[in-house]
């Protein structure tokens, strides 16, 4: 099991660079986390494993205000139609890639998507000011998702340890011929 952050986007296509930029800043903050960059969301399916914790950062286009941040637990629910359904600058949209992974049984148990509302995807253009200004908040959302997943996994590990201890006690009582 590993923690994995994936930045989706193309740094040469305006606001589409935001996912990659968020991932790069997370790498600087959390050297213990594996950070990958892809221009096509479908590439992520081969990068993760079912027991991984994965946070994906990507540009979204839902008609909201540039720089708005959307956080979705994609392991628990489908990505909202309209935000990640179209391919944008990608051959395949993130929503389609996630649903393909779900259908193939390749969805990680913890998958959070952090999207930054984008508007301009032109070749050779910089990120819009509002999108660039949202990067620190998106980085914080990714870090929070990682911390929340770590806390949940620690709780599950403790519950597993408690279950083992209870099983050991029951076995010891059985060996003594008593009732648990």
For the regions a protein language model found, what residue spans apply to each?
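Glycine-rich phosphate/diphosphate-binding loops and the adjacent beta-loop-alpha structural elements
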Residues: 122
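N-terminal catalytic or cofactor-binding beta/alpha core of small enzyme domains
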Residues: 1-116, 125-137, 144-179
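Short "lid" loop at the C-terminus of a central beta-strand within the Rossmann-like core
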Residues: 119
